[in-house]
Amino acid sequence: MEDPVIRIPPYHYIHVLDLNSNVTRVEVGPHSFIRQDHERVVFSPKRMVMVPPRHYCVVLNPVARGPTGAVLFDGAGQAQLRHADLDIRLTQEPFPLYPGEELQQGVTPLQVVLADTALRLRALLDFEDEDGNKFVAGDEWLFEGPGTYIPHKEVEVVETLQATIIRHNQAIRLRARKECLDRQGTRRVTGEEWLVKRVGAYLPGVYEEVVDVVDAYVLTDKKALHLRATRTFEDVQGHVRRTGEEWLVTQEQSEAYVPDVFEEVVAEVLVTTLGPRQYCVVLDPVGPNGQPQLGQQRVVKGEKSFFLQPGERLQAGIQDVYVLSEDEGLLLQALQTIKDTDEDGTEVIRRAGDRWLARGPLEYVPPAEVTVLERRQALALAENEGIYVRDIRTGKVRVVTGQTYMLTESEELWEKELPPGVEVLLAEARGDTAGQDSGIQSSSGPSFGVQERDRTRAVTYQVPHNAAVQVYDYRERRARVVLGPELVVLGPGEQLTVLSLSGGRPKRPHARRSLCLRLGPDFCADIVTIETADHARLQLQLAYNWHFEVPEDPKALGRLFSVPDFVGDACKALASRVRGAVAAVTFDDFHKNSNRLICSAVFGFDEGGRLREHLRFVPNGLVVTSVDIQSVEPVDQRTRDALQRSVQLAIEIATNSQEAAARHEAERLAQEARVRLERQRLLDQAEAERARRELLELEALSAAVESAGAARAEAQARAEAARIEAEAAILQAKLKAEAVAIETEAELARLERMQAQEVRAQRARAEAEAARAQALAAVEASKVREVAAALGPETIRDIARAGPELQVKLLQGLGLQSALITDGAAPLNLFSTARGLLGLAVPPEPSTS
């Protein structure tokens, strides 16, 4: 059952509900509350709300209080509430919450606003503060620190504002959220932006917002700032800038520049520095009025540093001054009529489009009215080198060779075009490709490995020894032939004649291309198919030796090139003659007389019926001097087999006859060898018999000598042996006596040495023992002296007397006057009696040794 007595501690309270009147009241401790039957305690004792210093709390539906601060109650005794109202309570005595009151916000520390900080406040309803200031709902203002903000129920804290730190070379960009006055008292309209450049902390106003922190651009003598106006305004220097206007700010105007809100930074412009040998051309330069002069140019020479103004640009960047040596020049052209001086210093008028050449040595900076078309250098040409030069006024082309030449203002280099085949052959002649002989063998098409030729250089060709080259001039329609060794330099309208010769076996047309014609002597080979009268088809491989007859008249040299393919034409003509001659004979006749038939067919016979020595082709002077039959092969298989069988049979017959002759010769040589061998054998036998007879005679003589000398030698040997034995016995006895004497002397010496050693050892031991005893005695004596000196006489006397006195005292302590038990057999030692009775060990006797 619930206890009716409720003990309320100090600073606690309870709510008591009267069930009869349905009114709740507050009971505050300390006291003991006795609950009545018609009352009910809503909750157990609860601690009062305590607001410490610098804190506050918010109470919802606070009680109404009178002028004196007392709580107002209605007629039923219920505390009157201000419903939907708030009450902010600061530091005060602990207070209870009346029925209906709610603690909307607990005890909270008051907000401390630091320096350079502010609270943006907004009025929730119309009110008037303690200072008489009236605020309308929606008004905003700042509570700036340092200070402690006391909250009000009519005001809400929107945000906390921090001051923006403005450092050196910085500014902040502000924007007005509505019409207001800024910190300097200037009126700002909604959306207006401005800069604040004052160094330090800046706290924006209530209707100001920080858009950005703008860093200043540090300007040096090498960097400037390109600005553009976004609207018409007046800058800090007092100049009125129109929308879109661009200008440059340099270090002379400001070392650190902060762009205004209506200024847009286009770029940072670096200084343009010109060296003493440099210049530049500025396009669209800015005039004295600050406006760009469109279409104009200005040449700036070094040594100088400047900034390009807005709208200005360099034509080709920074350029080097033209420094010309003696062999250099500049081709110039006037863009408009100007006054100039020539090489002699005379003033001349240059019209627009005029061209002239400025020759070195000089330093030249072209003015804005002059353009440099080309930088020319004198071309050093050797005796065998040249260039093609064309006059642009007349169009004539000429060749300049063997001198150092510089083109004039009306001349230019001309490129000579050559057919691709000629280019390949010339490259092979120069060794620029992997071709073989210079112009003798080449492919019919252009090669991809050919290096590009300088077409402005004169085309030269080295004519080999014993060769000829034909050069045709298409302008004058005449040809000239050059015999090697010689260097050919082609004129502007000249071309080299390309020979297209047959090659291979059998000959194929256009197999070889060449620029030169070999004059020989040389040879060419061809394969000719012939048919005999008995229809035997044969294939001949023939080789012809040839050369050209060179006429002495230079005008007649052109006939050498009258036949383009002299190899093919000659081989065809010779093959026709051979085929005609062979067709009239049978195979056997041709096989027997092939060389005579072919030579007669090729060379023919003179009026006397003799075989000619050469064949001459009249159109080009080609002379064939000899014919060589390298091989003859039948074309028909059966003919080839029959010919092969006949050849094999002839070979077998010749081989058999050679074998028979060789066998007969071998038998003859073998028979002669056998006869010589038999004769030699008989001679050897006779010689052997004669040698054996001599041997027997010598053996008999030796036996006689041997029998006579054996007895004499034996007697001499016995006598000598007896003498040697006697001498050996005498020598042995003498040696034995000497050995015994030596042994005796050695033994005696050994015994003497042994005895001497023993005597010395005994003497050393005795001396060592005596020294040891003497040292021990000295040590013992020194020990006794040192112990006695250390203890002193008094201590020694006390030690000597301590033993007997102690024994007497012990016996007295035991209560014994005297006692002795012994038998007659045991001797008595009264000196150790007391020690024995006490159980002490007898001290050992000193050793007499």
Swiss-Prot record:
GO CC annotations, alphabetized: cytoplasm; nucleus; ribonucleoprotein complex
One Pfam family from the record: Vault_2
Disulfide bond as UniProt keyword: no
UniProt entry keywords in alphabetical sequence: Cytoplasm, Nucleus, Repeat, Ribonucleoprotein
Cell location: Cytoplasm; Nucleus
InterPro entries: Band_7/SPFH_dom_sf, MVP, MVP_rep_dom, MVP_rep_sf, MVP_shoulder, Vault_2, Vault_2_sf, Vault_3
MVP repeat coordinates: 2-54, 55-109, 110-162, 163-215, 216-270, 271-321, 322-378, 379-458, 459-521
Quaternary structure note: The vault ribonucleoprotein particle is a huge (400 A x 670 A) cage structure of 12.9 MDa. It consists of a dimer of half-vaults, with each half-vault comprising 39 identical major vault protein (MVP) chains, PARP4 and one or more vault RNAs (vRNAs).
Function (record text): Required for normal vault structure. Vaults are multi-subunit structures that may act as scaffolds for proteins involved in signal transduction. Vaults may also play a role in nucleo-cytoplasmic transport.
Name of the molecule in the record: Major vault protein
Organism: Gallus gallus (Chicken)
